[in-house]
Curated annotation (Swiss-Prot):
Cofactor remark from the record: Binds 1 [4Fe-4S] cluster per dimer.
Top-level taxon: Bacteria
Positions with a binding annotation for [4Fe-4S] cluster: C94, C131
Entry binding sites for ATP: G8, K9, G10, G11, I12, G13, K14, S15
Cofactor: [4Fe-4S] cluster
Summary of subunit composition and partner proteins: Homodimer.
Similarity section: Belongs to the NifH/BchL/ChlL family.
Annotated GO MF terms: 4 iron, 4 sulfur cluster binding; ATP binding; metal ion binding; nitrogenase activity
PTM: The reversible ADP-ribosylation of Arg-97 inactivates the nitrogenase reductase and regulates nitrogenase activity.
Protein's name in the database: Nitrogenase iron protein
Function: The key enzymatic reactions in nitrogen fixation are catalyzed by the nitrogenase complex, which has 2 components: the iron protein and the molybdenum-iron protein.
Entry keyword set: 4Fe-4S, ADP-ribosylation, ATP-binding, Iron, Iron-sulfur, Metal-binding, Nitrogen fixation, Nucleotide-binding, Oxidoreductase
Length: 274
């Protein structure tokens, strides 16, 4: 079973990218579990046809210790298994701690057991690696390969670089490696070339360039992934390509994060800062 975590700055499209990629893998016959590690609990909605499923933490709060696996995992598109860790009530407690509680419970209840024949587990993780709880999939070896969703915007690249620092910190202890950058295009000038160069300097690859297409939002409004909503649309092929590249990926590295002045010089070089 391959253990994958998707990171990236808030609002970059991690949950959308994760679910569309998982749809591509599921369509190709892979057994995938998605663990949403975001208090917004929107990491599985499109795979479940719009169902806002009850989170692990909400279930624990209501049921106490009497939680069964079927209470917290729902079956989604083409047999994908979906769960949301959820978070504390706003303004109370630590969301990172909630992820740790949720993943531990999933392990205790046998969500990762051989009987499920899982090929992949995907962790869709909130924002930047800023607190230990959100770094947990990296830190405790829950995830072995990381993909960072970014774009040619400065803050997205800055966040990607920060996440690389987190991977570097835990690479020896947890055995985690960077699998590549996924460029979720924002139609910035020279975006593809810039992210390819950023990847090269960090020591990784841009595994796929996902072009911007409003059809993604149209599918979302209809509560589906692109592949589910219209399998013949060109954007569906983009996500299939990304799924295939992740499935075939052999490049796993310990990244070399850039200093801030190196990052800024990259932005200047490609004209974004002019």
């Amino acid at each position: 079973m391959r253990k994958v975590a998707i990171y990236g700055k808030g609002g970059i499209g991690k949950s959308t990218t994760t679910q569309n990629t998982v749809a591509g893998l599921a369509e190709a016959g892979k057994k995938v579990m998605v663990v949403g590690c975001d208090p917004k609990a929107d990491s599985t909605r499109l795979l479940l046809g719009g169902l806002q499923q009850k989170t692990v933490l909400d279930t624990l709060r209501e049921e106490g210790e009497e939680v069964e696996l079927e209470d917290i995992i729902k079956e989604g598109y083409k047999g994908s298994r979906c769960t949301e860790s959820g978070g504390p009530e706003p303004g109370v407690g630590c969301a990172g701690r909630g992820i740790i509680t949720s993943v531990n419970l999933l392990e205790q209840l046998g969500a990762y057991d051989d009987e499920w024949n899982l090929d992949y587990v995907f962790y869709d993780v909130l924002g930047d690696v800023v607190c230990g709880g959100f770094a947990m999939p990296i830190r405790d070896g829950k995830a072995e390969e990381i993909y960072i969703v970014c774009s040619g915007e400065m803050m997205a690249m800055y966040a990607a670089n920060n996440i690389c620092k987190g991977i570097l910190k835990y690479a020896d202890a947890g055995g985690v490696r960077l699998g590549g950058l996924i460029c979720n295009s924002r139609k910035v000038d020279n975006e593809r070339e810039m992210i390819e160069e950023l990847a090269r300097r960090i020591g990784t690859q841009m595994i796929h360039f996902v072009p911007r297409d409003n059809f993604v939002q149209r599918a979302e409004i209809n509560r589906k992934t692109v592949i589910d909503y219209d399998p013949t649309h060109p954007q569906a092929d983009e996500y299939r390509a990304l799924a295939r590249k992740i499935d075939e990926n052999k490049m796993f590295v310990i990244p070399k994060p850039l200093e801030i002045d190196e990052l800024e010089s990259l932005l200047i070089e490609f004209g974004i800062a002019n």
